[in-house]
Amino acid sequence: MAKKVTGYLKLQVPAGAANPSPPIGPALGQRGLNIMEFCKAFNAQTQKIEKNTPIPVVITIYADRSFTFEMKTPPMSFFLKQAAKVQSGSKTPGRDSAGKVTKAQVREIAEKKMKDLNCDTVEAAMKMVEGSARSMGLEVAG
């Protein structure tokens, strides 16, 4: 018989840097989960990923206080900032440009994010990436 799910918890944790300090410790602790068990398992799974890459995680919490977690791909803004080689987006998107990304870079990001996006084609995913780029104040060049 399947375990009874009591809830889900969404966190964004830097790769290889999960530790019991806030925000991870309190979020897991108040739900009665073993914090160190999560930290060790997460850090083991993110060994091959570049350090401090933000990884969204969905933790499924069961009635017996056990858990499983699923890692997603890093946020689109992370990939866009890397591609444009900027630290942050524009403070006034639409007026000031923070940088540029090419269509090839947009396609590459769309292909990486495809499994986490709610679209069927790469072209639809590219439109989502372009929209995110524009909202960050990045220009999409030819």
From Swiss-Prot:
Post-translational modification: One or more lysine residues are methylated.
One of the Pfam families matching this protein, by short name: Ribosomal_L11_N
Top-level taxon in the UniProt lineage: Bacteria
Entry keyword annotation includes Ribosomal protein: yes
Record's keyword terms, sorted: Methylation, Ribonucleoprotein, Ribosomal protein, RNA-binding, rRNA-binding
Family to which the UniProt record says this protein belongs: Belongs to the universal ribosomal protein uL11 family.
Subunit structure: Part of the ribosomal stalk of the 50S ribosomal subunit. Interacts with L10 and the large rRNA to form the base of the stalk. L10 forms an elongated spine to which L12 dimers bind in a sequential fashion forming a multimeric L10(L12)X complex.
NCBIfam families referenced in this protein's UniProt entry, alphabetically: L11_bact
Name recorded for this polypeptide: Large ribosomal subunit protein uL11
